[in-house]
């Protein structure tokens, strides 16, 4: 299926590009999330009429993400979790826990899907570098300090 991208999509293309994707990807992800439309003649005409508006919205989103990234860059998040005497956690710290901690710290715009844990969930006490992808072009490094609450 050919679609017109309504915003930048990682590993696919930029705003306004017409790309060919699998039908399921278009129907189940891109179109419901308003990231793309089917590439019909009517949709192309409507897109060209709204192109300036969509580019302005994209620029505003990018500026907001860069502003948040400037505040978030180098931030150190402390998470306390129950742990055994050897430093292993009972359970783990997931991207949802990190996103919740960042929201409590005043970064409300961070969603769990934006948090990237390079080695999977954190299962031991220590400091871990993680990345937060605020926008397709804005990725920020954050340090998560996991402290153990001896059970």
UniProtKB/Swiss-Prot annotation:
Gene Ontology annotations of biological process type: translation
GO molecular function: rRNA binding; structural constituent of ribosome
Gene3D superfamilies: Ribosomal protein L9, C-terminal domain, Ribosomal protein L9, N-terminal domain
Pfam family of the protein (one): Ribosomal_L9_C
Record flagged with keyword RNA-binding: yes
Keywords linked to the UniProt accession: Ribonucleoprotein, Ribosomal protein, RNA-binding, rRNA-binding
Family statement drawn from the similarity comment of this UniProt entry: Belongs to the bacterial ribosomal protein bL9 family.
Described function: Binds to the 23S rRNA.
Protein name: Large ribosomal subunit protein bL9
Protein source organism: Bordetella petrii (strain ATCC BAA-461 / DSM 12804 / CCUG 43448)
